[in-house]
Amino acid sequence: MSVTTSTIADLGRRARAAAPTLAVASTDQKNAALDAAADRILEGNELDLVRGEIEGISANLLDRLRLDGSRLEGMASGLRQVAELPDPVGEVTAAWDRPNGLHISKVRVPLGVVAIIYEMRPNVTSDAFGLCLKSGNVAFLRGSSAALDSNRVIAASIRAAVAGTGLPADALVLVEDVSREAAVEFMQLRESIDCLIPRGGPSLIRSIVDNATVPYVIDGDGNCHVYVDASADLDMAVSILHNAKTHRPSVCNAAESLVVHADVADEFLPVALAALDGVEFVGDGRSRLIAPSIGVAEDDDFATEFLDLKISVRVVNNLDEAIEHVNQAGSGHSEAIVTSDEAAAQRFCKEVDAAAVLVNASTRFVDGEEFGFGAEIGISTQKLHARGPMGLPQLTTEKYVVRGDGQVRA
């Protein structure tokens, strides 16, 4: 059944109405709701996989839909882990005294209603709820048609669990209309939404930029690079590249492009191709002269997030060319250098414009859980108000609290 514009607005009003209660909920209340929700995460995924296979969704995109026993356990475990994390609400981030006797402090407070519009992965329903609740925010969610059945079941389970602990069920509000018109209306609920976070591909991001009238944080493309420097330990480089590309190719922190210094390209590329058997390599002319099995890369390939077992290759003469290429073709997500030259590592870290830069480590580590944040709401590729993995602190804002004893301004 299609949900009308007025109904979407009603959902927004419900989310807004629940926000004040969540903003002042105690840590114990929030943790109890998280633990209860973890116990209620059950089923509803089989239909989505069947539909996906019928509609011809690729295997790697089906991986985003899959919620087998281990992933369901992972969702429940993620909620419990968030319950164990420090509550950011009420944290004093700075405090000072003025000569006139005023005491000024900055205190973390919830954003209010955090809207998330996302594609494919139904586990986002659980992850987003957990982080929003622990940070005192309402989770206002709109998923994709492919995962609708799972999202409904997960949301219903969570809402029932939350209500059973005394907090409002509307701590999670799910929009079930998956039409484009509903998505645009969702992006424009200025009276209800404090922050919108998209979790999806380029078309979703373009839609947000073109249509959203609410504040948003872009969880953008992950066109991530691995640069193998002239001084690199080549065994280490192969291991890092293999992990970055093949561990989970459908996620945003997977490597999509390989950049190799010319001094080591002759030795490295044949070894890399052999190690990454099953991965399609497309490259520039220099890389194909070294390894003829590398396919011809179109210009767009160097700026493409493949989300599959495919990678582009470019050979460069020096670090300057590597940095220039990464900054030009990259998406500002995560970029890695493999090197034993500390000066090269420092230059790469300073000059590459990305949310995360890694030295001698896989791009797959750019993740809230790996960073110690617990589950993440996304990885921001913009610079305001958050950048990189967004955990609990990034779902708050700061309020100034000023205490005096009768001071007035002269």
Model region roles, listed by residue range:
Residues 1-103:
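N-terminal Rossmann-like NAD(P)+-binding subdomain of aldehyde/semialdehyde dehydrogenases
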Residues 6, 39, 120-123, 127-138, ...:
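ALDH superfamily catalytic-core signature
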Residues 67-68, 77, 179-198, 203-207, ...:
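Aldehyde/semialdehyde dehydrogenase
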Residues 95-139, 144-154:
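Substrate-binding/gating loop at the entrance of the active-site cleft, primarily
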Residues 96, 104-110, 133, 164-168, ...:
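Solvent-exposed alpha-helices and their adjacent loops that cap or buttress functional pockets
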Residues 160-174:
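A glycine-rich helix N-cap at a beta->alpha junction
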Residues 319, 324-409:
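C-terminal core of ALDH-fold dehydrogenases
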